[in-house]
Amino acid sequence: MNFETVIGLEVHVELNTNSKIFSPTSAHFGNDQNANTNVIDWSFPGVLPVLNKGVVDAGIKAALALNMDIHKKMHFDRKNYFYPDNPKAYQISQFDEPIGYNGWIEVKLEDGTTKKIGIERAHLEEDAGKNTHGTDGYSYVDLNRQGVPLIEIVSEADMRSPEEAYAYLTALKEVIQYAGISDVKMEEGSMRVDANISLRPYGQEKFGTKTELKNLNSFSNVRKGLEYEIQRQAEILRSGGQIRQETRRYDEANKTTILMRVKEGAADYRYFPEPDLPLFEISDEWIEEMRTELPEFPKERRARYVSDLGLSDYDANQLTANKVTSDFFEKAVALGGDAKQVSNWLQGEVAQFLNAEGKTLEQIELTPENLVEMITIIEDGTISSKIAKKVFVHLAKNGGGAREYVEKAGMVQISDPAILIPIIHQVFADNEAAVADFKSGKRNADKAFTGFLMKATKGQANPQVALKLLAQELAKLKEN
């Protein structure tokens, strides 16, 4: 029997506000344990939460970017549960009236087709703290993350393969990043994914029993975890067994899923309206203000890069996959850089350098200004493409002006015949055996002189000019 796969994804995204959702404490990642905390995060008696307006701004932008309807009458709810990293014993979230609902996003699949994936809801909530288990037998609680603002985006169960789930996450990450509401860095926990997956016989409308997958710390692991789970569930069903409603985690080392707990029924969190936060309304004016702050999104940028700048679909997709790269490209072209040349550098030498150094574009000293200047001095013959690679590495590590560095480092390309011809004559004098081979008509003997000349000029000879002059002087040599 063959089965149809049904997948839905729950994505938690940390919003990039300066402070937390209900307290003035910094929401920045990477500080010492419990450095970003105060009495609200610790849940001291008598303290009251105050809603951060910037969080609602971000929620409105997310809803608009994901084509969602917006609940204008807003309130928060208490989700009651006990865990050491949750000192209040409840989480402030949104239950029956999320900020956004009934949305969709269009994704591009591997075969080039597109599919619209429904988004059931997007709700605002606070993050919990973090438990760490020490080798000394103690467990420690870090509340830096407690109260960091989240938006949870819940898709419809519209995906039918791990590939579609991967495409959905890629598109969602792009939209959220372009909207400017999160850096969506999975390695820092600012984007976290849970997957719900079930199988059903083809033609059956009723969903099968679902399994929830956790510990999916990369898009690649989402795909691998789903692929394994499809295989596991299919084997159980084909052998006459039944799927239990479980929560499982993906084991990256063994590429399997491991049981965490069995769900006997839906968890009862005893939701009720948050009494410490007043109701409020999102006005049409507020929504329109947020709409005007939204940028051009990847789909529109890709189309413009192809139609206006003459880039290929591939180049347009590569450049817009990351907003930082795309914004860098935009500025470089606005400064007069040739679109294709800028694209080639960003996808070639720049990407290789970033991979080798383990850095992002924001973490190096290359700027649109000095990249465009470097491309300009390649085009005007000041430096060769070979020398440009060395210049680029210097700019990436140290910044500064490309032309200034080239001149100070003595890298300016030699194009003057008055300088090159004497060097060519010296090459002949220094390589008598090669001259004899050439005069005797030995095959390809002339090729050696190209290398001799480039070595003599330390690679600074303009290749086009040098080859023309070399051919001219070799012809004279043969006549003598």
Swiss-Prot record:
SUPFAM superfamilies: GatB/YqeY motif (SSF89095), Glutamine synthetase/guanido kinase (SSF55931). Keywords: ATP-binding, Ligase, Nucleotide-binding, Protein biosynthesis. Its EC number is 6.3.5.-. The keyword Ligase applies. Pfam families: GatB_N, GatB_Yqey. GO terms for biological process: glutaminyl-tRNAGln biosynthesis via transamidation; translation. PROSITE patterns: GATB. It catalyses: L-glutamyl-tRNA(Gln) + L-glutamine + ATP + H2O = L-glutaminyl-tRNA(Gln) + L-glutamate + ADP + phosphate + H(+); L-aspartyl-tRNA(Asn) + L-glutamine + ATP + H2O = L-asparaginyl-tRNA(Asn) + L-glutamate + ADP + phosphate + 2 H(+). It comes from the Bacteria. It is an enzyme of class 6 (ligase). GO terms for molecular function: asparaginyl-tRNA synthase (glutamine-hydrolyzing) activity; ATP binding; glutaminyl-tRNA synthase (glutamine-hydrolyzing) activity. InterPro entries: Asn/Gln-tRNA_amidoTrfase_suB/E, Asn/Gln-tRNA_Trfase_suB/E_cat, Asn/Gln_amidotransferase, Asn/Gln_tRNA_amidoTrase-B-like, GatB, GatB_C_1, GatB_Yqey_C_2, Gln-tRNA_amidoTrfase_suB_CS. Heterotrimer of A, B and C subunits. Allows the formation of correctly charged Asn-tRNA(Asn) or Gln-tRNA(Gln) through the transamidation of misacylated Asp-tRNA(Asn) or Glu-tRNA(Gln) in organisms which lack either or both of asparaginyl-tRNA or glutaminyl-tRNA synthetases. The reaction takes place in the presence of glutamine and ATP through an activated phospho-Asp-tRNA(Asn) or phospho-Glu-tRNA(Gln). Belongs to the GatB/GatE family. GatB subfamily. NCBIfam families: gatB, PRK05477.1-1, PRK05477.1-2, PRK05477.1-4. This is Aspartyl/glutamyl-tRNA(Asn/Gln) amidotransferase subunit B. It comes from Streptococcus pneumoniae (strain P1031). The lineage of its organism: Bacteria, Bacillati, Bacillota, Bacilli, Lactobacillales. The gene is gatB.
